[in-house]
Amino acid sequence: MPKMKTKSSAKKRFKVTSTGKVMAAQAGKQHGMIKRSNKFLRNARGTSELSAPDSKIVKSYMPYDR
């Protein structure tokens, strides 16, 4: 049986930690930051953990990052 392929779009956007959590960057930061509050900009830095249902979907895209 051939090897399963990893979705290229997923490997660019998500990171799986050693404990199995899926981390992703905050959405909505491409443009229009002038009207955002400072609190939003501060909280949007870095990455955040995906919810359990979303993590399950993302992990199916990356069969070797578990």
UniProtKB/Swiss-Prot annotation:
GO terms for molecular function: structural constituent of ribosome. GO terms for biological process: translation. The keyword Ribonucleoprotein applies. GO terms for cellular component: cytosolic large ribosomal subunit. Keywords: Ribonucleoprotein, Ribosomal protein. Belongs to the bacterial ribosomal protein bL35 family. This is Large ribosomal subunit protein bL35. The lineage of its organism: Bacteria, Pseudomonadati, Pseudomonadota, Alphaproteobacteria, Rhodobacterales.
